Amino acid sequence: MSTENTLSVADLARENVRNLVPYQSARRLGGNGDVWLNANEFPTAVEFQLTQQTLNRYPECQPKAVIENYAQYAGVKPEQVLVSRGADEGIELVIRAFCEPGKDAILYCPPTYGMYSVSAETIGVERRTVPALENWQLDLQGISDNLDGAKVVFVCSPNNPTGQLINPQDLRTLLELTRGKAIVVADEAYIEFCPQATLAGWLVKYPHLVILRTLSKAFALAGLRCGFTLANEEVINLLLKVIAPYPLSTPVADIAAQALSPQGINVMRDRVAQTVQERQYLVNALQQTACVEHVFDSETNYILARFTASSSVFKSLWDQGIILRDQNKQPSLSGCLRITVGTRQENQRVIDALRAEPV
């Protein structure tokens, strides 16, 4: 066979995968910093001791202790909980279970979390965007106009990267608009920082509501890769058909169960209180910093701010080993950087570096 007729391995791949721009995670973007404030992680490590040593056996598909502990914590039934490799896997499972590639669409409202788009594109499902309003709330009319053929609507509340909660009345309206037509996924990755805003209590009324949760943020376990999907039992049973047979390793399940014990949850809540206190310190300091044009309200463990010269500020801090998250490419976020709330020492380094910037 001539070399002219030989396909490269890349040519054998699906066209949408060849054209795919992968999600630019904080770790993928790299950097050589010692102050990492770009991934909304908790700034200090937590310690656990493994209690399960049966690594010669496959783990449970849905570890009973993890499911029961999370159900009790979230105020739902165990049958309404699915555990997965981070909330990102939950995003993918919902799309795989409900969307026909080449036929159905997902819908989301930028600026928002990038994995909704990447997961849909990977699977070959159409992506529709309805940009958020100027105040970053939902454009309900725009969503209504684009619902035909959309099987899944993603809403992040509090929203990443903007930090604000979505108006609960708008969420109710969205759930009524989509009843019998589409699944609504409420991404609550940051809900521990504003627990009063959870939609978990709405599952009784809305059979098409799905809620995503994670241990990566307030539980300080980003390295564990453990997330949860809350939904009615009918939805959970569908997702169980498409999830991998052993999504959680034994060590992950072991640590997750410990983190979700009453003691673990109390420690998490103390951590949240500490983070909220540091967030206010950082907000106050940013508001008194010359190169900062505006600091947006936040209900999370990060702050979005608009700068007079964000690109040069980002690079200057990067060169000093302070790694922030550039949001300039997100719709309506020109001039914006996202700053994870760190320790007091890290937050002070950010402020000192910003105040040294030319205006």
From Swiss-Prot:
Hey, which pathway is this one from? Amino-acid biosynthesis; L-histidine biosynthesis; L-histidine from 5-phospho-alpha-D-ribose 1-diphosphate: step 7/9
Give UniProt keywords alphabetically: Amino-acid biosynthesis, Aminotransferase, Histidine biosynthesis, Pyridoxal phosphate, Transferase
The UniProt record lists the EC number as 2.6.1.9
Q: Which transformation does this protein catalyse, written as a reaction?
A: L-histidinol phosphate + 2-oxoglutarate = 3-(imidazol-4-yl)-2-oxopropyl phosphate + L-glutamate
Q: Which cysteines are joined by disulfide bonds?
A: none
Q: Which cofactor does it need?
A: pyridoxal 5'-phosphate
Kindly indicate whether the keyword Iron-sulfur belongs to this entry.
Answer: no
An annotated GO BP? L-histidine biosynthetic process
N6-(pyridoxal phosphate)lysine sites (modified residues)? K217
List the GO molecular function terms: histidinol-phosphate transaminase activity; pyridoxal phosphate binding
UniProt keyword annotation of Amino-acid biosynthesis present: yes
Q: What PROSITE patterns does the entry give?
A: AA_TRANSFER_CLASS_2 (PS00599)
Q: What InterPro entries does the database record attribute to this sequence?
A: Aminotrans_II_pyridoxalP_BS, Aminotransferase_I/II_large, HisP_aminotrans, PyrdxlP-dep_Trfase, PyrdxlP-dep_Trfase_major, PyrdxlP-dep_Trfase_small
Q: Which domain of life is it from?
A: Bacteria
One protein family per Pfam:
Aminotran_1_2
**Family per UniProt?**
Belongs to the class-II pyridoxal-phosphate-dependent aminotransferase family. Histidinol-phosphate aminotransferase subfamily.
Description of how the protein assembles with itself and partners: Homodimer.
Put simply, this protein is called Histidinol-phosphate aminotransferase
- Say which species the protein is native to: Salmonella typhi
